[in-house]
């Protein structure tokens, strides 16, 4: 999907809207004087409700605020909410009404003023609204930056609250000071002793895999302008980029990827004696990125190449042997890089399916998967299964982030299966490049999970199983019911629709049915959790297999046979 196509579509709809609004204004002005012809309105002019729906859909451009190519497969932008002065005044009035007079007197006695600052130092890159780069940075960093700026620049606060807020801001500043390209570095992967492959790291010539080059995003005449970036574990390996702030093919921008790669190396791989120099480079790199200064950015990358060549390898190995904390954002960066190389050039093939069928393609976002996998207690002793694994995103994330003993996926579509193979190959190469141990991953591709011998073999051992049944029809849901019958007690099922049908009642002729032993919990689906919309599309469900029958299926409200009794209120 090209950027030009998106912008041209937006301009067409905006022109249609302007013409339609002009017509509506003319009609409103002449409504009292001019009679309306019966055949003039129907079929020739869009109604206001139709136009509102089209305008609403055009708010959600798919790539404009993200540095990596964001097609229908990845996050979508929330519409910007502009707060007017009247809304701010109204909010101030409401907040004043809530405070009692006694509290106001106490606050005035112990109050102090805090000077407003232009831009807090702890605001991440990308928080400036006027910067050209803003559209290419993550919306999350913008929101978090605004919240921190507001907390520091408030007017009068009590002396106790002021000291607390200052301490909190200092804490945030210290924790975020070293995080510019990566986000939320405080959240770490579950510790496991075998995350880094020290045997591979000890040998500088052990990397022999081939990486997918970023040349695919560059025009032929620009290939000669590519510059190499070295990797800290294998300085002899260079990945070539076109260091340019303009968006390339498929909406790709290499600068944030380079920044994340360098910051990850400084954060995890640099020995303590070299960290200060590395952090200075990252800050300079971020400044050049915000200014869209390509020449300065290129010079800093070359300085980084020279710096990592001077670091003794034994210090790097010693640092990684101490099992440093690995941020989740580093894992997501690695997954995103593999996704970009393997999926984006072929993404259009995933659109070839029958609408509203069992073969409709959709993805679950990495942030959402991190949350739900933690809720299920996924760990290095778990076996994970994904029935309908698509391009393999959930399978490889469960393996890399949580270190599952085995991660298994089953996919029937040919195009998605091809891309799953490409993505797994790229992931293995990049894990070796970063010296990471990748636990076992297995796929059953171009096959259905129905009557699948490998699925039948793994089901009794499975600890967590993911079934994206958002649009499954009744016959396929019946097949899912048959597949999960062999799950052991304690295993968990993640789904977007409840595996057990609403209003399910126990069948005394089929007491062994696993639906009788499912404890189903529903959770609110966060925004930006699925690929087809940024909005929350309802709930997701985690069903736990119990040893005994779930007592909730005996509850009349669950059976749906007794309506909720509401008290009758009499009014005059």
Swiss-Prot record:
Question: What is stated about the way this protein's activity is regulated?
Answer: Ubiquitination of histone H2B to form H2BK123ub1 is required for efficient DOT1 methyltransferase activity on histone H3.
Query: Compositional bias (Basic and acidic residues) at which positions?
Result: 20-31, 101-111
Q: Which InterPro entries match?
A: Dot1, DOT1_dom, H3-K79_meTrfase, SAM-dependent_MTases_sf
User: Which GO molecular function entries does the Swiss-Prot or TrEMBL record give?
Assistant: histone binding; histone H3K79 trimethyltransferase activity
Give the CC-aspect GO terms: chromosome, telomeric region; nucleosome; nucleus
| Keywords annotated in UniProt | Chromatin regulator, Methyltransferase, Nucleus, Repeat, S-adenosyl-L-methionine, Transcription, Transcription regulation, Transferase
**EC number in record:** 2.1.1.360
Top class in the EC scheme: transferase
Residue numbers spanned by region Disordered: 1-48, 75-173
Its localization reads:
Nucleus
Its UniProt entry gives the catalysed reaction(s) as: L-lysyl(79)-[histone H3] + 3 S-adenosyl-L-methionine = N(6),N(6),N(6)-trimethyl-L-lysyl(79)-[histone H3] + 3 S-adenosyl-L-homocysteine + 3 H(+)
Q: Where does S-adenosyl-L-methionine bind?
A: 361-364, 384-393, 411, 448-449
Which residues are in the DOT1 domain? 245-558
BP-aspect Gene Ontology terms: DNA damage checkpoint signaling; DNA repair; methylation; subtelomeric heterochromatin formation
Give the Polar residues compositional bias ranges.
Answer: 1-19
Q: Which SUPFAM superfamilies match?
A: S-adenosyl-L-methionine-dependent methyltransferases
Family in the record: Belongs to the class I-like SAM-binding methyltransferase superfamily. DOT1 family.
Q: What does this protein do?
A: Histone methyltransferase that specifically trimethylates histone H3 to form H3K79me3. This methylation is required for telomere silencing and for the pachytene checkpoint during the meiotic cell cycle by allowing the recruitment of RAD9 to double strand breaks. Nucleosomes are preferred as substrate compared to free histone.
Q: What else does the entry mention about this protein?
A: In contrast to other lysine histone methyltransferases, it does not contain a SET domain, suggesting the existence of another mechanism for methylation of lysine residues of histones.
Q: What is this protein called?
A: Histone-lysine N-methyltransferase, H3 lysine-79 specific
Q: Which organism is it from?
A: Kluyveromyces lactis (strain ATCC 8585 / CBS 2359 / DSM 70799 / NBRC 1267 / NRRL Y-1140 / WM37) (Yeast)
Its gene name is DOT1
């Amino acid at each position: 999907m090209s950027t030009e196509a998106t912008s041209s579509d937006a301009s067409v709809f905006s022109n249609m809207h302007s013409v339609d609004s002009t017509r509506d204004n003319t009609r409103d002005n002449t409504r009292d004087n001019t009679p309306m012809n019966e055949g003039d309105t129907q079929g020739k002019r869009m109604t206001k409700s139709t136009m509102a729906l089209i305008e609403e859909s055009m708010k959600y451009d798919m790539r404009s605020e993200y540095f990596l190519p964001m097609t229908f497969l990845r996050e979508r932008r929330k519409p910007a909410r502009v707060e007017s002065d009247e809304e701010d005044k109204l909010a101030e009035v409401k907040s004043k009404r809530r405070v009692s007079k006694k509290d106001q007197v106490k606050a005035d006695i112990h109050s102090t003023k805090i000077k407003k600052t232009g831009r807090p130092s702890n605001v991440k890159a990308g928080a400036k609204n006027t910067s050209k780069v803003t559209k290419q940075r993550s919306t999350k960093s913008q929101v978090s930056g605004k919240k921190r700026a507001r907390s520091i620049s408030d007017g009068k606060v009590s002396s106790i609250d002021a000291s607390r807020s200052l301490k909190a801001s200092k804490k945030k500043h210290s924790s975020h000071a070293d995080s510019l390209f990566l986000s939320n570095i405080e959240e770490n992967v579950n510790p496991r002793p075998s995350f880094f492959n020290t045997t591979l790291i000890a040998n500088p010539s052990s990397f022999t895999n081939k990486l997918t080059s970023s040349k695919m995003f560059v025009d032929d005449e620009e290939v000669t302008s590519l510059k190499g970036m070295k990797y800290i574990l294998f300085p002899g390996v260079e990945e070539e980029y076109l260091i340019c702030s303009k968006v390339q093919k498929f909406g790709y921008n290499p600068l944030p990827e380079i920044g994340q790669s360098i910051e990850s190396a400084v954060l995890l791989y640099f020995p303590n004696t070299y960290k200060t120099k590395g952090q200075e480079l990252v800050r300079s790199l971020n400044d050049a990125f915000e200014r869209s200064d390509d020449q300065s950015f290129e010079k800093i990358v070359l300085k980084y190449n020279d710096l990592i060549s001077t670091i003794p390898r034994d210090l790097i190995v010693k640092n990684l042997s101490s099992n440093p904390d690995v941020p989740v954002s580093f894992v997501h960066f690695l997954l995103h890089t593999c996704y970009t190389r393997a999926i984006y050039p072929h993404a259009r093939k995933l659109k070839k399916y029958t609408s509203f069928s069992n073969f409709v393609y959709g993805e679950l976002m990495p942030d959402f998967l991190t949350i739900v996998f933690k809720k299920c207690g996924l760990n290095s002793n778990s076996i994970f299964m994904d029935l309908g694994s698509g391009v393999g995103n959930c399978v490889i994330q469960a393996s890399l982030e949580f270190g599952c003993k085995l991660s298994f996926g089953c996919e029937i579509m040919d195009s998605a299966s091809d891309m799953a193979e490409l993505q797994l190959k790229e992931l293995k190469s990049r894990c070796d490049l970063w010296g990471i141990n990748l636990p076992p991953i297995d796929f059953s591709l171009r096959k259905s999970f129905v009557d699948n011998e490998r699925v039948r073999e793994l089901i009794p051992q499975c600890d967590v199983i993911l079934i994206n049944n958002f649009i499954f029809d009744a016959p396929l849901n019946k097949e899912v019911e048959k597949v999960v019958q062999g799950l052991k007690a304690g295993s968990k099922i993640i789904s977007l629709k409840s595996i057990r049908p609403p209003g399910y009642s126990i069948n005394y002729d089929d007491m062994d049915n696993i639906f009788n032993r499912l404890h189903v919990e529903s959770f609110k689906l966060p925004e930006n959790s699925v690929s087809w919309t940024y909005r929350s599309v309802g709930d997701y469900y985690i069903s736990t297999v119990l040893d005994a029958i779930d007592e909730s299926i005996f509850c009349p409200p669950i059976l749906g046979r007794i309506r909720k009794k509401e008290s009758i209120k009499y009014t005059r």
